[in-house]
Amino acid sequence: MSGSVCCACDTRFFRAQWVDCGFGGSSSVVVGASPQGLLRVR
């Protein structure tokens, strides 16, 4: 994976949101329990 991965906590879903920073200039928000098991949400 290219780019840096930022971790943010979403209290609305009580889940950890992994945001892929530096990807095509756009940030992809994914929800997963581990950085190796990311699930793209949006």
Curated annotation (Swiss-Prot):
Annotated protein name in UniProt: Uncharacterized protein TP_0280
